[in-house]
Amino acid sequence: MSGPRTCFCLPSALVLVLLSLSTSALGTAPEPSGVHEESPAGGGTDLLPHPEDLSASDNPDLEFVKRLYDFGLGKRAYSYVSEYKRLPVYNFGLGKRSKMYGFGLGKRDGRMYSFGLGKRDYDYYGEEDEDDQQAIGDEDIEESDVGDLMDKRDRLYSFGLGKRARPYSFGLGKRAPSGAQRLYGFGLGKRGGSLYSFGLGKRGDGRLYAFGLGKRPVNSGRSSGSRFNFGLGKRSDDIDFRELEEKFAEDKRYPQEHRFSFGLGKREVEPSELEAVRNEEKDNSSVHDKKNNTNDMHSGERIKRSLHYPFGIRKLESSYDLNSASSLNSEENDDITPEEFSRMVRRPFNFGLGKRIPMYDFGIGKRSER
């Protein structure tokens, strides 16, 4: 016999069974192929397709954006659907070749930026012989030629190792073919223009600025190269040897120092000073001969020594006159005192710092013979 509790449980169990059956039936039902969303207007629903189902033909803009971001290592971005053409703007990667941006090692790029190691301009192909011809050819460049050089693309920006640029041919042993570069031929062994030919072993046409080692100024008077004969082993070419030969004709000895004025800080004798020194030496030599009873060798030697300024260290002021030097062994000089003999021997080699001459008797530790 059933009680009231069992009567209440049976209906509740039936309700639960029905609910479970209804939910299982709803889960097995197929869903529609769209998404139900309310329209912005308010009523009804629309079915919108998923983004995955879109094709390239339905949305071409999406395909173009996809092509622009096809980067990577060795990637090739294509600008056409056929995928046989390369995109020249975004062709990046390792080993890529692009005409506008071909930078890197061993790249061959446009003419505007030919940088790198051992690069060669495109404008110089087949023009190696023109450099040698222009180096030997005309010295002046016409305005049209300068314009042609400036119009060339790579000649102004051809930098690197082994580059050849015509307007700026600097360095060691460079040869500038253009006439504008003749004034600035600097370096070692350069041969430049006449006014600024500096360096070692230069041969300058400018007579006022012929500096260097072993320079020989051109003989053209005192106003050009006579007052500035600097260097080692200079030859003063502006001395009138005829006048000197007439002055020393009676002694038959020629002043050899006038041909080779060596040393630093040489001073050329002016005509007025030359005459004054010559007169002074004649007076001093006569007084000296009366006191010491010596030959004319010393007076002639002192005259030659005073005509120019033999400054320097260990200078050989004048050469021996063998005919007069032999008089030392003659019978006339048997009674010469040791002091006079040492003075006679010391005169040909009067060396030291600060030579003494009749007008300028200065030096360090010098002994004046007068």
Swiss-Prot record:
Compartment annotation: Secreted
What are the protein's GO molecular function terms? neuropeptide hormone activity
Tissue specificity note: Brain, subesophageal ganglion and corpus allatum.
Q: Which UniProt keywords apply?
A: Amidation, Cleavage on pair of basic residues, Neuropeptide, Secreted, Signal
GO terms for biological process?
Answer: neuropeptide signaling pathway
Residues in the signal sequence:
1-27
Positions where Leucine amide occurs in the chain: 73, 94, 105, 117, 161, 172, 188, 200, 213, 232, 264, 353
For the modification Isoleucine amide, the affected residues are 364
Taking the first listed entry, what is the main subcellular location of this protein, grouped into a coarse class?
secreted
The propeptide sits at 28-65, 121-151, 236-251, 268-345, 368-370
- The answer on whether this UniProt entry bears the keyword Secreted reads yes
- What are the boundaries of the region Disordered? 29-58, 273-298
Any single Gene Ontology cellular-component annotation = extracellular region
Q: Does the keyword Signal apply?
A: yes
Q: Which InterPro entries would you find in this protein's record?
A: Allatostatin
**Database matches in Pfam families:** Allatostatin (PF05953)
As for family, the record states: Belongs to the allatostatin family.
Q: What does this protein do?
A: Neuropeptide inhibitors of juvenile hormone synthesis and gut muscle contraction.
Q: What is this protein called?
A: Allatostatins
Q: Lineage, please?
A: Eukaryota, Metazoa, Ecdysozoa, Arthropoda, Hexapoda
